[in-house]
Amino acid sequence: MFVDQVKIYVKAGNGGDGMVAFRREKFVPNGGPAGGDGGKGADVVFVVDEGLRTLVDFRFKRIFKAEHGEHGMSKSMHGRGAEDLVVKVPQGTIVKDIDTGEIIADLVAHGQRAVIAKAGRGGRGNKRFATPANPAPELSENGEPGQERNVQLELKVLADVGLVGFPSVGKSTLLSVVSAARPKIAAYHFTTIVPNLGMVDAGDGRSFVMADLPGLIEGASQGVGLGHQFLRHIERTRVIVHVIDMSGSEGRVPYEDYMAINNELEQYNLRLMERPQIIVANKMDMPDAEENLNEFKTKIAEDIPVFPISAVTKTGLRELLLAIADKLETTPEFPLNEILEQEDEDTVLYKYVAEEPDFEISREPDGTFVLSGAKIERLFTMTNFERDASISRFARQLRAMGVDEALRKRGAKDGDIVRLLDYEFEFMD
């Protein structure tokens, strides 16, 4: 089964909690704090495996949760960090964040790795909080929660050349005679419903990968039929080979077919029309094909190459394959996302991340004040509320961030309810 798009949930491991402990040893009356730090949680890491061909494994397992770090221990022993959760994906997999639409990773090379969900760091033990003013602190941190994401995996086949055209124009037949691929061939539309790849030998020592893509119909760019699924696989190709039935045996006009497919490519966007095209006039062994070809050439631009062939009789194939190989040598790869494009492997790409406020305050209809924000929520989840010293530290952190003053400006008074995540507190002025 060929599966090229799935949605999954990933959750990185939480950091281990820090420990509150003291050194208790004979003849050491003032041993001091000895609570260890928690261990780092496990990242969720995707790794490319060239042996995989589809995303079918993700149909049966859609939830991936990494292990948590161990908690800190007494005698200043730190918790062990968890081993990363490694998930294997096929070449050509794009990982997108469903909530933001951001492309997290574009995985194309065997062994390439990408951290999809980052683990939380371990909480600090009380030994970390010792100061001259407080040499024996009774506070520690909880581990930081690991990142969780709903992501979409899209598989876009890796091919140098993509065959496009209406159904039953001979794309599968062409691939079968120029490579060892054996796609399904039959005398009905949409015989090909999944991409087929074949390694093509041009005959002069050069070779390339050709993809036979399922037939397109008008409206494919808007998702008519299986348009989006089919067009997705064209994005990685460097050269588009447009196969046209020049015999008109299906009752269609070759030039209208050519314009209709190009319109779908343009509507789908992603710079597809910037890719060089080679037109293949197929079924030249059929009646009326020569006349239709002459008429077709009068309507298109002179600089667009047209190669008359017959995939059945194998005529004209050598000239076509050499022309494709020549075009590939002068055509660079097209990045799926310009932001991800790099000039070379040594280029360091920095991503700008807008600075978020430490916290935000909103108010619900019942008068409850709601605190939100990544920083304040992280401080809250890492606070050990079983320790009075930790609670006092959290209150000082809120005051230093300006939360108390901001609540007063919003009209908060003694006894008002303040909510943070799923917890509620009373405001005390």
UniProtKB/Swiss-Prot annotation:
GO cellular-component term (any): cytoplasm
One BP annotation, GO: ribosome biogenesis
Region (Disordered): 124-145
The keyword Cell inner membrane is annotated on this UniProt entry: no
Statement: the UniProt record of this protein carries the keyword Disulfide bond: no
GO molecular function, one term: GTP binding
CDD domains recorded: Obg (cd01898)
Domain OBG-type G: 159-329
Residues that hold GTP according to the record: 165-172, 190-194, 212-215, 282-285, 310-312
Residues where Mg(2+) binds: S172, T192
Obg domain sequence ranges: 1-158
E.C. code: 3.6.5.-
UniProt-annotated location(s): Cytoplasm
CC cofactor: Mg(2+)
Enzyme superclass (EC): hydrolase
Domain OCT, residue spans: 351-429
Protein keywords: Cytoplasm, GTP-binding, Hydrolase, Magnesium, Metal-binding, Nucleotide-binding
InterPro entries xrefs: G_OBG, GTP-bd, GTP-bd_Obg/CgtA, GTP-bd_prot_GTP1/OBG_C_sf, GTP1-OBG_CS, GTP1_OBG_dom, GTP1_OBG_dom_sf, OBG_GTPase
Highest rank taxon of the organism: Bacteria
Pfam family, any one: DUF1967
Physiological role: An essential GTPase which binds GTP, GDP and possibly (p)ppGpp with moderate affinity, with high nucleotide exchange rates and a fairly low GTP hydrolysis rate. Plays a role in control of the cell cycle, stress response, ribosome biogenesis and in those bacteria that undergo differentiation, in morphogenesis control.
Family under the similarity heading: Belongs to the TRAFAC class OBG-HflX-like GTPase superfamily. OBG GTPase family.
Subunit note: Monomer.
Name of the featured protein: GTPase Obg
Classification lineage: Bacteria, Bacillati, Bacillota, Bacilli, Bacillales
Gene: obg
